[in-house]
Swiss-Prot record:
GO terms for cellular component: cytosol. It comes from Lactobacillus delbrueckii subsp. bulgaricus (strain ATCC 11842 / DSM 20081 / BCRC 10696 / JCM 1002 / NBRC 13953 / NCIMB 11778 / NCTC 12712 / WDCM 00102 / Lb 14). This is Thymidylate kinase. The gene is tmk. Its EC number is 2.7.4.9. NCBIfam families: DTMP_kinase. It is an enzyme of class 2 (transferase). The lineage of its organism: Bacteria, Bacillati, Bacillota, Bacilli, Lactobacillales. It comes from the Bacteria. Phosphorylation of dTMP to form dTDP in both de novo and salvage pathways of dTTP synthesis.
Length: 212
């Protein structure tokens, strides 16, 4: 029995973590499968240690290729240890970020090339792709303003990047979304949280009606 794999993507400040948690609350009493919520970078013991290296604001000297490879290494461990076993059990896996983040942040934002970063991650994940990606669409400036309001002074290394970087990341996401219209569905994340959650729940239920 094969499971289902849903990823949530979007710029920093779009509210991915909050939305995922609210979506789970909304569907867990109705879903016929176990639900596993996870995140990237991280999701497993080794992957979380790599996460700490990647996001540590002190690591300002980290070059773009190192950053991309660390994300891929974390993802490889996450997939083999957490995601694939859950999918084999038949679970519904919901991940806060996945490969699309690397394509947008390192491929476009860091200028490494989306295709090049895609190749690295295809190797790292064994070509695993989500069944559905919900992209929480938010203007980068608005996202950074949200972060500053909530976590002022405690932003991670990527959140501390200037607006120009985050705008480039957003352009990367747009390219990825346009290349995968069947997989990626867009939700306006500038709406109030209940509206964003409702739209996300609707997408999950309409994409996988057999789960409910």
């Amino acid at each position: 029995m094969q499971g289902y794999f849903i990823t949530f993507e979007g710029p920093d400040g779009a509210g991915k973590t909050t939305v995922i948690n609210e979506v789970v609350k909304a569907i867990q009493g109705q879903c016929k499968r176990e639900i596993l919520v996870t995140r990237e970078p991280g999701g497993s013991k080794i992957a979380e240690k790599i996460r700490d290296i990647i996001l540590d604001p002190a690591n300002t000297e980290m070059n773009a290729k190192t950053e991309a490879l660390l994300y891929a290494a974390s993802r490889s461990q996450h997939v083999s240890e957490i995601i694939n076993p859950a999918l084999k059990r038949g679970d519904l896996v919901m991940s806060d970020r996945f490969v699309d983040s690397s394509l947008a942040y390192q491929g476009q934002g860091r200028g490494l090339g989306i295709d090049e970063v895609a190749q690295i991650n295809a190797f790292a994940t064994g070509h695993l792709e989500p069944d559905l990606t919900i992209f929480l669409d938010l203007d980068p400036a608005q996202g950074l303003a949200r972060i500053a309001k909530v976590r002022s002074g405690s932003e991670d290394r990527l959140e501390q990047e200037k607006l120009a970087f985050h705008e480039e990341v957003y352009r990367g996401y747009q390219k990825v979304n346009q290349a995968h219209p069947d997989r990626v569905k867009v939700v306006d994340a500038s709406q109030d949280l209940p509206q964003v959650v409702a739209a996300s729940v609707k997408l999950v239920k309409s994409t996988f009606p057999e789960l409910f």
